[in-house]
Amino acid sequence: LKSLQDLFLAADYSLVHSELTLQAIQQLDMFHAFKQAKSMWFEDALDALEISEISGWPDRFGDALLKWNASNPVKDIRTLSLFSGGGGLDIGFHDAGFNIVESNEIVPAFAATLEKNTADGRRLSGTRIVCKDINDYHPDLDNIDFIIGGPPCQTFSAAGARAAGVNGTDDERGNLFIQYARLIYKLQPKGFLFENVYRIVGAQSGKPWQQIQAAFEELGYKLYWRILDASDYGVPQFRERLIIVGLKTGAFNFPYPSHGPDSGDNRNYYSAKQALETVINSDNIPKALGGRHGHLLNDIPPGLNYSYYTERMGHPTPFFAWRSKFSDYLYKADPHTPVRTIKAQGGQYTGPFSWENRPFTVEELKRLQTFPDSYLINGNRQTAIHQLGNSVPPQFARVLALSIMKQVFSEKIPFDIKFMPANYELGFRARKSKLTDVYALKAKEAIDKIPSSINNAAKHVKHQEYFCIDSDLKVRAGLSKEEASYFVNYSLDSENWTINVSEPPIGIDEVKYKIIIQPPRTDTVLLKSTIELTSAINGEYSILVLWKIFEFLLKRHFLKDDLIQLFGYYQYKKSYQFKMFFQDKSLSDNNYWNVVKKVTEGIGVGVISSFEELSTEFGCSSVELQDILSKMKDYGFEIRNHNTNRQIQKGMILIPYSFPTLNERSLQRLTRL
């Protein structure tokens, strides 16, 4: 197979470079014929199940499997489901003919979903549901043949990584695989399937992955694993997951994809639009997004996200900095492809959103996850999304379960599935790496249609105004001098910005300190202006006031959403230079202000350091530094340690930014060092 792949690449190269030879054509034809013979199986599956690939076909696929199993009973494969969640794996294995005798789930709302679907006549009828912490779960079960489940994966996820590294097995949730292993040891099944996020393989330099493999192998199981994309198996959603199959005896190969470029017949992906064509929604269709960013969704082309509004994409009003948000922020699904991964949790602007510029309904999300229309989901909208987003798509689970049924238990299945050799390389990662260029082209096509006058950012503004900052860090402007706490005199033009903050009524106090910001030569937002922020207030709180008022004016006049969108996410290269100067020389003798100055200028910022290292860097004792950093956190600086972010080890500190970033919506504002 490998040599034929090489032949294909050689033939493909010849075709691309217009060196069309008879040998190249013959090689290409030979490879395609070989590939189809070895890897194509889904068309035969449709024929065997007597279904067609129309909207909602995964439901009919599952129903046809159940019907076939009723007429062709297999031996009783007693299966235990752990971390069952909303039941995605349970549905897939049940439909494939496994007997799910018991399911364990700790969250009552999720267990209630399972209970609803185990009633007489429901899909999982006959399964016993145990709502209990797995640490306290001691099942009294005999002759368990197989175990399925995936422990909670948040500690290995992209969100966990972005919070300041990946917790992995340093977090209690990351160690739940030990309980999984405990039950395998207790029940001694013939095999198991373990599902998790793919990042687990590289988390913490591979240490957790090595621990997981060692734990299972020590129990006497040989592991077969791959990172697979659910869209390759008929799910209208790009969803990469690590799948481990552990066996006491025998061997296992994963199935060839049924859909996409890696399938034997190059079958089209099951698109989001096709999946939703026949969905029946309830009357509770979500309205268009509201809030400060909701209106932005309307103009985002399908398939793109917040990055449409970045300077990198060429947008004339770049609200956001490149890579300053998660990839699902304001992500609008493309109807002609699978959607990106549906997440269990997220904020108001977490996608995917419909191409109709609204959130998807629960019924639509069920289709995008291939949950049966008839499957009951307990709870309100957010609870339902939590369950769906945490689940293995049932259609993906069906294909895996059938593959296990055939290879591990030697049972007949209604059609032949073709299995990949262990060294066969899938191409979804390579295709994913090319998407940035595709998105850029799509963005350019939309941006080229925007009238040049749309950028209404101010080119010259000079004004005086009264402000107030509430205790929750919310800025209020346009006040009377009696209502206000601060008087602001500012001038914004193409060469210089000057913003002076003082106390009412007329702001004639002497300047105490100033901050000079030098934009990079590539800046197109501030028009290369030098920015001078000055404060005539020397109270410790004034550093927050100065930055917050600058941020407010930036958003009002230059359409940047916040300081991070201007200066960039802390893990990326810094392009703006900050300098702080004390006009009031007494500030130089104050450790609080010396620490603020160093942080402003980027010293000790953006890296995780020990308390001792920062104490030396800032020239103060650990006790005093703790007090200063706590004050700065109260004043809006995002200071992180183990108490605020479990990903950070005890005794370590992270100051992500040189300026205060917390606002009235920040949960970090409520945490304490």
Give the residues covered by each predicted segment.
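A structural signal for well-ordered alpha-helical segments within the folded catalytic domains
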Residues: G87, P108, I178, G206-Q210, ...
